[in-house]
From Swiss-Prot:
Part of the 30S ribosomal subunit. Interacts with proteins S7 and S18. Binds to IF-3. GO terms for molecular function: rRNA binding; structural constituent of ribosome. Belongs to the universal ribosomal protein uS11 family. Residues 12-21 have a biased composition (Basic residues). Gene3D superfamilies: Ribosomal protein S11. Keywords: Ribonucleoprotein, Ribosomal protein, RNA-binding, rRNA-binding. InterPro entries: Ribosomal_uS11, Ribosomal_uS11_bac-type, Ribosomal_uS11_CS, Ribosomal_uS11_sf. This is Small ribosomal subunit protein uS11. GO terms for cellular component: ribonucleoprotein complex; ribosome. Located on the platform of the 30S subunit, it bridges several disparate RNA helices of the 16S rRNA. Forms part of the Shine-Dalgarno cleft in the 70S ribosome. The gene is rpsK. It comes from Nocardia farcinica (strain IFM 10152).
Length: 137
């Protein structure tokens, strides 16, 4: 019996992913700001993501990801990509305790998006998980 060749089987062709332009005039901006990073997602009213950016995606590494400036650049990047899909007005949902919350909202406005409502959706535990121990510096 001849040995099996590894190249047998159907060839996989690379399928090019085409970005179709969605025309969504109104969307939601979800800003998740943690102690280590800030993630900005802009979605349509159904919750499907139109564009996103994070501090790490913009090019920051390590402790610089948690700065307000990194959050500002991430929000500008996400807003620019969303405007290509026709987004003009957003409602903002902010989650988390991080330092980039207000800066991200301001930079969404500065990028040309009209901000409607701003709501804080940070989850509050009803005495759930034990929090991490306090740092002694």
């Amino acid at each position: 019996m001849p040995p099996k060749s590894r190249a047998s089987g159907p060839k996989k062709t690379q399928k090019s992913r085409r970005r179709d332009k969605k025309n969504v005039p109104h969307g939601n901006a979800h800003i998740k700001s943690t102690f280590n990073n800030t993630i900005v997602s802009i979605t349509d009213p159904n919750g499907n993501v139109i564009s996103w950016a994070s501090s790490g995606h913009v090019g920051f590494k390590g402790s610089r990801k948690s700065t307000p400036f990194a959050a500002q650049l991430a929000a500008e990047n996400a807003a620019r990509k969303a405007q290509e899909h026709g987004v003009k007005k957003v409602d903002v949902f902010v989650k988390g305790p991080g330092s980039g919350r207000e800066t991200a909202i301001r930079s969404l406005q500065a990028a040309g998006l009209e901000v409607g409502t701003i709501s804080d959706v940070t989850p509050q535990p009803h005495n759930g998980c034990r929090p991490p121990k306090r740092r002694r510096v």
